[in-house]
């Protein structure tokens, strides 16, 4: 589960940067 946390943060960061 801990491995999914940084992946989720990375995805959110990528989306925020795209916006």
Swiss-Prot record:
Keywords for this protein: Amidation, Amphibian defense peptide, Antimicrobial, Secreted
A GO CC annotation given for this chain: extracellular region
Highest taxon listed in the record's lineage: Eukaryota
Tissue spec: Expressed by the skin glands.
Function of the molecule: Has antimicrobial activity.
Protein's UniProt name: Phylloseptin-J5
Localisation: Secreted
UniProt entry tagged with the keyword Secreted: yes
Organism: Phasmahyla jandaia
Protein family: Belongs to the frog skin active peptide (FSAP) family. Phylloseptin subfamily.
Gene Ontology BP terms: defense response
Residues recorded with modification Leucine amide: 19
């Amino acid at each position: 589960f801990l491995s999914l946390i940084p992946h989720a943060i990375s995805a959110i960061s990528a989306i925020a940067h795209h916006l």
